[in-house]
Amino acid sequence: MKFNELKSFPVECRQSSMGCAKDCERKWLCQYRLGIKLRGGEYKEAATLGQIYHRLQCLGPGHEVEVRAEVRKQQTALMAGVERGEDLDGNMSRLASNLTMLYQKAEVMAHVFWKKFPQPEYFTTLGMEIKHSVEWQDGLFITGTLDKLLILSPSYDAWIRDHKSTGRPLSALFGGLSWSLQGRIYRILAEDYIRTVVGSMNNPVKGFILDGIITPGIKLCKADEKNAKEWKCSVETAYLRRVEEWYVSYEVKAEFDNKANTKALDSKAMLFTEPLYP
């Protein structure tokens, strides 16, 4: 296919495309308007860790085996690409070799978060990882993925819940929560999804819950094997215990240093008080 034969995709207003356009307009044109992607793969450790963590959070406790199987399947697909000669810059083999480590870290992050912020029983899950698109003015599409859509009992109000992991202080996540663009876009998507897909007019979207957790700076290593023998537990349990201690020490050190945000994980809710449309 020749370059002049490519057909452009409709403009989508979504977080990833807007971020790409801000960083590099040429990449945005190729990837999001023309559908051109580089052969091979990109090595983005934080993004891959976040994807695995998101998957664990969406499925919830008890589904670790399922997510682990998905990671193994991804590893197999990456190595198959390497054998076909698609690994032009070595990123595919690098990612495949590090996926196990990233899964181990994501799993302990999820367990630490579930322990401190379990989902309340008065919430029921209407949907998970909901991909939805709304056609806006002049052919503009608002698109996004809702991590979770929850129904509050007994009022039947709907709440959006989003999970984020970061290497920065949580103040970078929660600082602009009340006026964030993401919360407004997700509100539009959630209301349209409930009305057009669920077919309900009795579940008004009341608010946005944002969960944040800082990525731990340690990974499973020989120290956990040594601790497992000493504590008479599995290596995974020893690693979980060491990560829990890391989170405690992070918050203690942040408080000692008089930092503005001393928390390593948090969950905050924003109630929608303004009408969606003027």
Q: Where are these predicted regions, by residue range?
A:
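Nuclease catalytic cores
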Residues: 11, 15-65, 129
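Metal-dependent nuclease catalytic regions and adjoining charged, substrate-binding loops involved
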Residues: 13, 188-278
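Hydrophobic/aromatic-lined pockets within catalytic cores
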Residues: 34, 57-62, 114, 150, ...
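Short, solvent-exposed loop/turn segments at secondary-structure junctions
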Residues: 35, 133, 166-168, 214-217
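Hydrophobic (often cysteine-bearing) scaffold residues that line and stabilize catalytic clefts
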Residues: 45, 49, 102, 106, ...
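A non-catalytic, helix-rich entry segment at domain boundaries
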Residues: 52-130, 135
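Residue-level recognition of the N-termini of beta-strands and the immediately preceding loop/turn
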Residues: 124-126, 158, 203-208
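Non-catalytic protein-protein interaction segments used by genome-maintenance enzymes to assemble
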Residues: 127-194
